[in-house]
A protein has these predicted regions:
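Intrinsically disordered, low-complexity segments
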Residues: 7, 40-41
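Structured, acidic catalytic/metal-binding patches in enzyme active sites
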Residues: 47-303
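Sec/Tat signal peptide C-region and signal peptidase I cleavage site
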Residues: 42-46
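N-terminal secretory signal peptides that target proteins for export/translocation
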Residues: 1-24
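C-terminal soluble interaction/assembly domains
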Residues: 301, 305-358
Length: 358
């Protein structure tokens, strides 16, 4: 697909791959922290906490059983693609635990399974992606510390990058979420897309101060006097996103706007898959949402490498010395767990035995 930025026409990745990139970004703590900044300047807030999305996999199973079977087959072939809670062991160390999290405020997600809650309660140390989320001020400071990474500093505005139709669609989408268009006019497309991708009900809960899962885990632990450690900084997440081409993020934003209310269905389906532990089905499911196509310029491959795989390595490397103390409860985004390059396999390569807790 070709889009125009300024006077340049550029070829960008196909719809399916771009949506995968957007949803992967949705799983970054950075996107969750961003909302605190946006909502702080919002003059209006969405009032309804009720999410109205439907499960796309249920619909697919009914309408296209063959395609559904393909999705299940691909998910089953994903290493460590089943389960969100894992036990980490090593001779001479107390058992530690790994939870795949989802950075949302959905009460179904916040309600940890009893065995996971018991492990969290009994742990000496809590590890999350970034401990900066314990303070909204620190999170906001991290986001604003490098304005060139989050904002256009050369006079560019989002209005100049979008068609009149897409710009109007963006304004309407933000208004439904209680975010004024003026608040994001100079923000980079990926910053805006992170907010637009979330259902209005999620925005509403965040506006009311309801924490997302990782934030709640960390806050509860800090209140109990437990040590809370982070594996990366929000600035590092910021840098990773900013290193990808603006055209990539602009296309993600446009596609999010085009999906409209269907994004509610996508997020609801992701949530259902998370709650059932079918993490390996997330990416195959997303491929059914957008049209098929080839990624001629390998944009998604670059995204996956920089945002998922590279960060997996950082998380596993930095977690190892903390896990060496034993009795650790670690929570990172669930999409970081599965696959040959996932956190689970990387921890195994460091000598840990990691097994699923049923």
């Amino acid at each position: 697909m070709t889009i125009t930025v300024g006077h340049r026409s550029l070829r960008v990745a196909t719809p399916g791959n771009m949506l995968l990139g957007l949803i992967a970004a949705f799983h970054m703590l950075l996107a969750a922290a961003l909302l605190a900044v946006l909502l702080a300047v919002s003059s209006a807030q969405a009032a309804d906490d009720t999410c109205t999305g439907k499960n796309l996999m249920t619909e697919l199973q009914q309408n296209d059983p063959a395609r559904y079977a393909e999705v299940v087959k691909e998910a089953d072939a994903t290493p460590n693609g089943k389960g969100i809670f894992w036990k980490i062991e090593k001779p001479g160390l107390k058992t530690s635990w790994l939870l795949g999290s989802m950075h949302v405020t959905d009460p179904r997600v916040l309600n940890l399974p009893l065995y996971a809650q018991a492990a969290r309660d009994g742990a000496d140390t809590i590890v999350i992606e970034s401990d900066e989320i314990l303070s909204e001020k620190k999170a906001a400071a991290a986001l604003l510390s490098r304005p060139d990474l989050t904002m256009f500093t050369d006079g560019t505005t989002i209005e100049k990058l979008l068609s009149r139709e897409d710009y109007a669609r963006l304004g309407a989408g933000l208004q439904r979420r209680g975010i004024p268009l003026s608040a994001v006019s100079r923000m980079r497309p990926w910053m805006i897309a992170s907010a637009v991708a979330l259902p209005a009900c999620e925005i509403s809960r965040k506006a009311k101060g309801i924490p997302f899962l990782d934030q709640k885990i960390a806050a509860d632990a800090a209140a109990e006097g437990k040590q809370v450690r982070g594996l990366e900084t929000l600035a590092e997440q910021l840098q990773a996103m900013a290193e990808l081409p603006v055209e990539f993020h602009l296309k993600s934003l446009i596609e999010t706007l085009e999906l409209g209310s269907k994004m509610n269905d996508v997020v609801e389906t992701m949530t259902d898959l998370y709650l059932s532990g079918d993490i390996g089905m997330t990416i195959p499911m997303l491929k059914t949402v957008s049209p098929d196509g080839k990624d001629e310029e390998s944009d998604y491959a670059s995204f996956e490498q920089r945002i998922i795989l590279d960060r997996n390595k950082i998380m596993a490397e930095r977690a190892a010395p903390i896990l060496a103390s034993g009795n650790v409860f670690m929570a990172v985004g669930a999409l970081h767990l599965p696959g040959d390059g996932g956190v689970i396999e990387l921890l195994r390569k460091q000598g840990f035995t990691v097994t699923q807790v049923n």
